[in-house]
């Protein structure tokens, strides 16, 4: 609602609105639009359409894989710009960690992504580096992700960043004394015991 949006910052824009028909929690294939006046009509929201809320693609449910696909394209695009630039190696790694990776890390706390997809993105990252002379094809990939203090290059792995984010989230929920968060903890533990998705089993 217009009043409820003020605390979030965005302004109410009727041109970006759609009508969504839901019956018993299921989106209906209803093409009825809402006519506000003679010159303005709010169109019905199609089943295959998507919208962004706080930068995350959604439909009637979270589109985790679609969000990962879009974010990974932007991540690799930024990496290509960084590693084809005349920056020094140290600055390229810093830019990769602080400018490119946040495209994905912003979404990690709320998304559920397969490890195989994240490993593929890490391989694409190394491919970009090789193509731009930032890494020798035969050089150890493990050294790439070690800190510079111990002989590595300090690059952050997407897979590792995702795991760290999920572990921190699980620890925060598990150690919280907030009554509301305890309800989340109990629900997650119950889900884990039944073999369903949970913050404790997502890895």
Regions found by a protein language model. Give the residues of each.
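Short aromatic/hydrophobic-glycine micro-motifs
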Residues: 9-10, 56, 134, 155
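Short amphipathic alpha-helical coiled-coil/interface segments
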Residues: 118-129
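Extended C-terminal regions of large enzymes
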Residues: 121, 136-203
